[in-house]
């Protein structure tokens, strides 16, 4: 099978000669793609990966590529089983010299997406000859339509509801022959014929991926139902309708992502002190002190820390809810030494900086740009994770937090609904604090609930944290996620992915 993704965090070393050099991340898709590929590879699945060749990001020199190609050639001379290269890089100078995965301008981003798909359609698919293709988001949206024309079943994963549109003419000018599969694409207006559609009638790339695929999935069950039911007005009508069509045809599912196994307080090298659920009380204090020193917060291991690890994006992530009440919660819980820590980039970064300066909150509130190691330390140091997202296709911080003993505070939506349940100490259930009204007062209520929990006697509080950590490790893991994807793959193929799997799932009839 072939997984097509514009970004990935890492690849298993056994997949190719330069696998250890390939890392390009812009968001959660990179982590999810990496974890899924690793899980499939470890199970013995014949998995191949196609991604752009971000030469500068990969720190790959031309000499490395020549050495890798020469080694593959030599292997082919001496062995029938030559350790087949499973990594397929889309080659074009459009990718070579980038400092980041996605351009800042939509036109440049569109060009990059079309070039990537050209290489996959014209070169990589014919070379790999996959039995099944797994595509991800709008930058792979043309591929399901092409694959359908070739008789290759395709799974299309919607990580983000962002899309782009363009004409057949523009697509063809990038070297993709749409004349052979244009009927499998989704147009802004109902197409009459190829010639009529070619110049004016634009193709929607994300919706084309949904329309052309044999099966689709979102990255949480609740977000799928929210889209199908039209809960979110900002989702474009054509996207909502096509996802609803797939759902009603029995060809859509929500599959929760999971954090990478590397997120573990037992092994995380970014921590000042590693720990387990059994010794978390003492070791989290060590990490808290180190985090406070590095961020300029007042050093106090008894201070409750509320940690913001996500983008400061007011459209999705809800930082404006916190900015409205930040002064009030610091003031009202001054005697409790409450601290708030941001390790994130985004539009509201300067907003929080100004609040800190205006009220001289420098030792109570830190605003730090995103840094991977500091963010990981933040999970270990903090007591609560702030995620008041208006919508959330999946989300990962609310799953990482419990694994590190930091309880999430979330709005009841999408993947947050699927992963966080309100804490019920009496029944020893739940793993966080959930508010139902997306406004500042709703968030304030949840923070108050968290502070009530923090004020409990230590034996009661620590017992709940230990339970939540253990449940987090058991629940939020990549084996569970990979199992769900394997079920879909096998249903689409109507056979096991690997030969030693004896049981088969009930087949899903592909949409023809």
Predicted segment positions?
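Catalytic cores of nucleotide-sugar-dependent glycosyltransferases that transfer UDP/GDP/TDP-activated
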Residues: 1-512
């Amino acid at each position: 099978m072939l997984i097509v993704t514009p970004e990935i965090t890492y690849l298993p070393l056994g997949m190719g000669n330069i696998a250890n050099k390939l890392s390009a991340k812009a968001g959660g898709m990179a982590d999810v793609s990496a974890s899924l590929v690793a899980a499939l590879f470890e199970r013995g699945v014949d998995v191949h990966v196609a991604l752009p060749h971000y030469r500068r990001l990969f720190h790959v020199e031309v000499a490395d590529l020549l050495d890798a190609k020469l080694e593959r050639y030599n292997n082919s001379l001496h062995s029938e089983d030559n350790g087949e290269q499973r990594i397929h890089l889309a080659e074009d100078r459009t990718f070579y010299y980038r400092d980041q995965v996605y351009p800042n301008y939509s036109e440049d981003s569109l060009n990059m997406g079309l070039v990537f798909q050209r290489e996959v359609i014209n070169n990589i698919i014919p070379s790999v000859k996959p039995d099944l293709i797994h595509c991800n988001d709008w930058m792979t949206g043309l591929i399901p339509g092409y694959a359908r024309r070739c008789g290759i079943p395709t799974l299309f994963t919607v990580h983000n509801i962002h899309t782009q549109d363009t004409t057949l003419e523009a697509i063809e000018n990038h070297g993709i022959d749409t004349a052979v599969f244009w009927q499998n694409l989704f147009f802004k207006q109902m197409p009459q014929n190829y010639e009529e559609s070619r110049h004016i009638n634009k193709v929607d790339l994300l919706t084309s991926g949904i329309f052309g695929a044999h099966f689709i999935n979102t990255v949480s069950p609740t977000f799928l139902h929210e889209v199908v039911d039209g809960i979110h007005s900002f989702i474009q009508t054509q996207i909502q309708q096509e996802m609803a069509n797939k759902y009603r045809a029995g060809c859509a599912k929500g599959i929760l992502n999971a954090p990478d196994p590397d997120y573990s307080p037992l092994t995380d090298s970014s921590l000042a002190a590693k720990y387990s659920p059994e010794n978390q009380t003492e070791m989290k204090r060590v990490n808290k002190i180190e985090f406070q020193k590095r961020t300029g917060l007042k050093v106090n291991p008894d201070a409750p820390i509320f940690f913001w690890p996500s983008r400061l994006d007011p459209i999705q992530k809800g930082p404006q809810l916190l900015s409205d009440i930040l002064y009030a919660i610091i003031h009202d819980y001054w005697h409790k030494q409450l601290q708030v820590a941001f390790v994130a980039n985004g539009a509201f970064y300067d907003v929080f900086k100004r609040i800190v300066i205006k009220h001289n909150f420098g030792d109570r509130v830190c605003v730090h740009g995103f840094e991977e190691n500091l963010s990981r330390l933040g999970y270990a140091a903090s007591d609560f994770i702030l995620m008041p997202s208006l919508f959330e296709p999946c989300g990962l911080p609310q799953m990482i937090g419990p694994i590190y003993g930091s309880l999430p505070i979330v709005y009841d939506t999408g993947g947050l609904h699927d992963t966080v349940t309100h804490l019920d100490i009496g029944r020893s259930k739940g793993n966080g604090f959930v508010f139902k009204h997306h406004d500042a007062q709703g968030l304030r209520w949840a923070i108050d609930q968290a502070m009530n929990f923090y004020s409990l006697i230590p034996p009661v509080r620590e017992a709940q944290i230990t339970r939540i950590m253990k449940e987090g490790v058991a629940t939020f893991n990549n084996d569970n996620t990979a199992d769900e994807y394997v079920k879909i793959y096998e249903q689409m193929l109507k056979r096991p992915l690997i030969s030693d799997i004896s049981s088969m799932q009930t087949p899903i009839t592909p949409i023809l």
